[in-house]
Every structure is written in C-alpha cells, then in structure tokens.
Amino acid sequence: MTQSSPQNLILVGRVAGAFGVRGELRIATYTEDPLTLTRFKALTRQDGSPALTVQTARVVKDGVVARCAGVDTKEAADALRGLRLYVPRAALPEPDEDEYYLADLIGLPVRHVATDELLGKIKSVQNFGADDLLEIDPALGGQTWYLPFTRAAVPEVKIADGVVLADPPALVGEPEGPESPAEDDDGERHYD
C-alpha cells in the first residue's frame, strides 16, 4: 500500500493488547462492522508507515481478536499496545448522502446557527471518554475551545455546503441569550 499523507488517513482502530500467548492482538475497532479491518490490505500508523497486516480476525466484545503478520508472541503483541491503526480515506466506502466520516469535519468552518457569525474552523475531533468534542480554532485567533458534538450544540452539519452550524452552550457565568454585558463607570461588567 502506498503511504498517504496524514491528513488523508482515517483512524479505524487501536491495539488494546495481547490476547493469549501466541501473539494474537485485541483490537478496539472504530468501524460499524468490526471485521472491516480484515478487508484492508494493510493498516498504517498515523505517519502512513506500515503498522499491521491482519491475516485473520474474529469478533469479540469491543472489537476483534486478530492474528497479524509478524506478530508471533505475547511479548510482540504487548509491545504494540496503544498503537493506533489507520487506513487511507480512499480505502473506505463513500458515506451515504446524509452521512459523513468525522475526519471529513476537519477544516470546516463553524458558524452560529442564529447569527451566521463565523466562530472558527474545526481543528480536530476528540473523545475524552464521553461524547465527541469538536476542537475549534477561533476565527479571531486565540486559544482553541471545545464544542460538544451533540444535536443541541451542533444542530446541522452541511457537508455538501462545507459548513457546520453550531449553537454553543453558554459558559459558566455568562447570561443566557444574545445580551452582552454592559460596563459601569468602574469598568465592572453587569447584566441588565
């Protein structure tokens, strides 16, 4: 398989560790069908270099147990724990009209659903254990911020139009709604 640039790679799984003593790997899969991993000629690392070639696999809870070329011992399998597995975007089937891959969101502008204000661009999609979060690079510069990838915070994703519409939740201490704080003579903010 030819190497792909990192931005054209899609994360499809992660080596969770060894399974047994003969070098089989437990792989957590991020595909709808866990056995999809067996359909790819080879899995790569994030930099596009070869990682694993799956020879056989069977479904288990949270993924697959796989036998991979060149991994013949428990120690070799354990050494791969945490390895993220990627495939080129072109190796995946095209999503249906109203579907998309999370990687397709990277780089899309995010606009406020009510005001059409440009909030920023999606830098990455993260998951720290709960729901997915969109990391937003602010339009006006500054530190990136996270937007929950929920129906309430992201009511519309328009892949064909190349835009994500968002209704970010209010920050702690901010008023609800579009009002902005006024400053009094001492420079302190208050809300009317």
From Swiss-Prot:
Report the Pfam families cross-referenced here.
PRC_RimM, RimM
Q: Which GO terms describe its biological process?
A: ribosomal small subunit biogenesis; rRNA processing
Domain of life from the UniProt record: Bacteria
Boundaries of every PRC barrel domain copy: 97-172
Entry GO MF terms: ribosome binding
Q: Which GO terms describe its cellular component?
A: cytoplasm; ribosome
**Localization of this protein:** Cytoplasm
Residue ranges, annotated region (Disordered): 168-192
Keywords on this record? Chaperone, Cytoplasm, Ribosome biogenesis, rRNA processing
Q: How does it assemble?
A: Binds ribosomal protein uS19.
Give the record's family classification.
Belongs to the RimM family.
Q: What is known of its domains?
A: The PRC barrel domain binds ribosomal protein uS19.
Matching NCBIfam families: 16S_RimM
What function does the entry list? An accessory protein needed during the final step in the assembly of 30S ribosomal subunit, possibly for assembly of the head region. Essential for efficient processing of 16S rRNA. May be needed both before and after RbfA during the maturation of 16S rRNA. It has affinity for free ribosomal 30S subunits but not for 70S ribosomes.
Q: What is the protein's given name?
A: Ribosome maturation factor RimM
The organism named in the record is Caulobacter sp. (strain K31)
What is this protein's gene name?
Answer: rimM
